[in-house]
UniProtKB/Swiss-Prot annotation:
Keywords: Ribonucleoprotein, Ribosomal protein. Belongs to the eukaryotic ribosomal protein eL21 family. The keyword Ribonucleoprotein applies. GO terms for cellular component: cytosolic large ribosomal subunit; cytosolic ribosome; extracellular region; nucleolus. InterPro entries: Ribosomal_eL21, Ribosomal_eL21_CS, Ribosomal_eL21_sf, Translation_prot_SH3-like_sf. This is Large ribosomal subunit protein eL21z/eL21y. One of its GO terms (molecular function) is structural constituent of ribosome.
Amino acid sequence: MPAGHGVRARTRDLFARPFRKKGYIPLSTYLRTFKVGDYVDVKVNGAIHKGMPHKFYHGRTGRIWNVTKRAVGVEVNKQIGNRIIRKRIHVRVEHVQQSRCAEEFKLRKKKNDELKAAAKANGETISTKRQPKGPKPGFMVEGMTLETVTPIPYDVVNDLKGGY
């Protein structure tokens, strides 16, 4: 018989709960606040069947475009053929978590604002552009003696006899 093509086909391991994370859902899952524009990771919780997204969206990062009482609307990119479409899906809060994709950007932005404020107080202009890492500085290897290595000539006749 042919394999089924159901909504949850081939998700035995994909939707399995992690080791020592089975059982009740912590209350903090429901007490988190989501705002429009936040980045979230779609991470399906196999224990809750309501509001579960399709397996394609598991592990995807999207942006919240709608917030309802029990669910959030997430806008996720999906490649279809040769184009990328922004798909809008509604997912229950149990299946999403705050993404850390913009964490580094927010820290850099905060640091740059502090640097700009300090530079403005001193009356100077600074560049907040990131510079690529340059080559490593050179160093001298000390305490080593040079040893000249010469190749040993290969003797075909002796090698066939089994000797050196």
